[in-house]
């Protein structure tokens, strides 16, 4: 057995079950126990039907779903390495997630379904006060992720550097410095978050350009179109027309929009929240 570094795991005990910690300790679980754990602290054998590995990338996409207050929580000095939630009913989707996780050649729709089901399993732990500290302790989100989470909780707000810094309980100068160290700025992230949201509203929901502009925090439709064209290389209307042609064939526009609907694209994975 080997420890699983990076990532987290979700284990489901249909019957009595034992997990071995890296320090040699044994943890015993009863049937119906759902476990969320720091994978680096667990040793797992080759029998994988009762657990699902959750990658850092997937956790990063789950994080923006949380309210910004969650990111103000400081990890406890002694964060537990695992949490247990006892389920009174069977979890039929767990086996499906486990099977999808073992398949290395998932179709695009299967990949999205797997991600959505993992999010559903993670949500079971949201009422546990230790869940967010453990999640943050494992993920250690960078400043980009924190800023995008704040923005996406109120995408239409007139965000300024000072306002975002206030939400994150730090000075504007410190926030600016930390973002510079990560090679970005608050204005760049604000544009990225708004453009990703605009793409979702236009392609997936067919919202009018005027409503999209307002929903994304732009008072001027013409300025919104200008920013959109600079970001995507075409106007919102042109993007609508192209995506309408490609959606039946699952082309790149559909792919980009669908992935954005599940909290991110390769271009900005950290900050999309519907």
Curated annotation (Swiss-Prot):
Gene induction? Expression can be activated by RpoS and repressed by CRP, H-NS and GadW, depending on the conditions.
- What are its GO cellular component terms? cytosol
| UniProt keyword annotations, A-Z | Activator, DNA-binding, Repressor, Transcription, Transcription regulation, Virulence
Source taxon at top rank: Bacteria
**SMART domains, alphabetically?**
HTH_ARAC
InterPro entries found in the cross-reference section: Homeodomain-like_sf, HTH_AraC, HTH_AraC-typ_CS, Tscrpt_reg_AraC-type_HTH
Tell me where in this chain the HTH araC/xylS-type domain is found.
145-242
Q: Which Pfam families match?
A: HTH_18
Tell me, what is one Gene Ontology molecular-function annotation carried by this entry? transcription cis-regulatory region binding
Q: DNA-binding residues per UniProt? A: 162-183, 209-232
What PANTHER family would the database entry show?
HTH-TYPE TRANSCRIPTIONAL REGULATOR GADX
NCBIfam families for this protein: PRK09978.1 (NF007432)
Functionally, this protein is described as follows:
Positively regulates the expression of about fifteen genes involved in acid resistance such as gadA, gadB and gadC. Depending on the conditions (growth phase and medium), can repress gadW. Negatively regulates perA expression in acidic conditions and positively regulates it in alkaline conditions.
Self-association state and partner proteins as the record states:
Homodimer.
Write the protein's name: HTH-type transcriptional regulator GadX
Source organism of this protein record = Escherichia coli O127:H6 (strain E2348/69 / EPEC)
Q: Which gene encodes it?
A: gadX
């Amino acid at each position: 057995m080997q420890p699983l570094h990076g990532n987290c795991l979700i284990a489901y005990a249909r019957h009595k079950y034992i997990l071995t910690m890296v320090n040699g300790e044994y943890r015993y679980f009863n049937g119906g126990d759902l476990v969320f754990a720091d994978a680096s602290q667990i040793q797992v054998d080759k029998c994988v039907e009762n657990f699902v590995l959750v990658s850092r990338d997937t956790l990063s996409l789950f994080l923006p779903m949380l309210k910004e207050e969650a990111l103000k929580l400081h990890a406890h000095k002694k964060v537990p390495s695992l949490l247990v939630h006892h389920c009174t009913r069977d979890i039929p989707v767990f086996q499906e997630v486990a099977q999808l996780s073992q398949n290395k050649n998932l179709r695009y729709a299967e990949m999205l379904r797997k991600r959505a089901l993992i999010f559903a399993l993670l949500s079971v732990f949201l009422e546990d006060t230790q869940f967010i500290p453990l999640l943050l302790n494992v993920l250690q989100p960078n400043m980009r992720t924190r800023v995008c989470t704040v923005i996406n909780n109120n995408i239409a707000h007139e965000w300024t550097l000072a306002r975002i810094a206030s939400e994150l309980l730090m000075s504007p100068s410190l926030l600016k410095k930390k973002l510079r160290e990560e090679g970005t700025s608050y204005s760049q992230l604000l544009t990225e978050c708004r453009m990703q949201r605009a793409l979702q509203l236009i392609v997936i929901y067919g919202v009018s350009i005027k409503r999209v502009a307002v929903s994304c925090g732009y008072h001027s439709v013409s300025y919104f179109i200008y920013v959109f064209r600079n970001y995507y290389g075409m106007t919102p209307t042109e993007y609508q027309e192209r995506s309408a042609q490609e959606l039946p064939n699952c082309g790149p526009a559909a792919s980009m929009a669908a992935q954005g609907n599940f909290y991110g694209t390769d271009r900005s994975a950290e900050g999309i929240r519907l």
